[in-house]
Amino acid sequence: MTVFLSEHIHPDARKALEAVCTVVDNFDHPDEIDAIILRTFPVDATIMDRCKNLKVIGKHGVGCNTIDLEAAKARGIMVLNTPRANTNSVAELIVGLILDISRNITLAHEKSRDGKILKVAPAEMTGMEVSGKTLGLVGTGNIARRAAEILKNGFGVNVVGYDPFVTKESMEAMGFQKYDTVKELIAASDIVNVSVPLTPATKDLISGDTFDYFRKNAVLVNAARGGIVNETDLYHALKEEKLRAAACDAFVTEPPSAANTNLYELENFIGTPHIGACAEEALCRMGDEVVHEVIRVLNGEEPAHRVV
């Protein structure tokens, strides 16, 4: 059995894969490939057709937006993912970003480093406490719920949620108040977190006049996927101070830089290069799980988390 490993995974997971499969790091002989394990590598219908023996695609992580799921389904190629392996690491990053932009941590560091702070506790570094604020969740999946748990237990936040796939009763059972629209949720929130997959329905979910509903002191975090928050509209909203600040760990063009987004021009924005799952523990869990599940499929068994 031959597995195409498109990107780096945890060394222990690779060793486990190499113990039972032939692992290739190149696409020189696609007709010999039985499985693909990927992180962000794009797999479309053309790739699938070149891999005539392809049986399974394993996603190292959660989001499958780089895989043509309809094409895989039409060709009888199974797709699986690891939906809970990185929950804690991404949730922790979300909490970190919220604290950072609420208290101007990165901004204070940069200004101090550059000699632009002339006295201690300067007024322009005045931030916002997270404790007791209202956290609005756009999407209430595993990651969002874990972030909410940390913030609720640690900071006493009140949690409200928007999720068209979750009933009012189910959301109340989570301890969240449900809102029926994104705009209503934003208007009721001091902190807005985006944790939904990128789909045609969620593309530009937060864009245009939606930014008019933000509280002036609110902060926004997107550690999900680029394209859910419209970056051009976010830039203008931040520049016009329609909200306090924003932080993104996901961008339309990745890795992000000042060359491909003007958001980095702003002092009330911080951006990280999709590092949500980049914790040793999460990488170990994701690697172990995706390897284990792909091997199961190649041995004729059903995976625990099948996407198609």
Label every PLM stretch briefly:
Residues 34-35, 56, 191, 219, ...:
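Short, Asp-centered acidic motifs that coordinate Mg2+ and/or phosphate
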Residues 208, 217-308:
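Rossmann-like dinucleotide-binding domain for NAD(H)/NADP(H)
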Residues 123-216:
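Rossmann-like dinucleotide/phosphate-binding beta-alpha-beta segment
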Residues 83-134, 146-154:
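Phosphate-binding beta-alpha-beta segment of Rossmann-like dinucleotide-binding domains, i.e.
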Residues 1-80, 184, 207:
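An N-terminal-biased, well-structured beta-alpha scaffold segment characteristic
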Residues 41, 62, 190, 196-198, ...:
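Short glycine-/small-residue-rich Rossmann-like dinucleotide-binding loops
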Residues 52-55, 67-79, 194, 198-240:
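Beta-strand-loop-alpha-helix segment that lines the small-molecule cofactor/substrate pocket
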Residues 31-32, 53, 187-188, 213-216, ...:
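Alpha-helix C-terminal capping/helix-to-coil transition sites in glycosyltransferase folds
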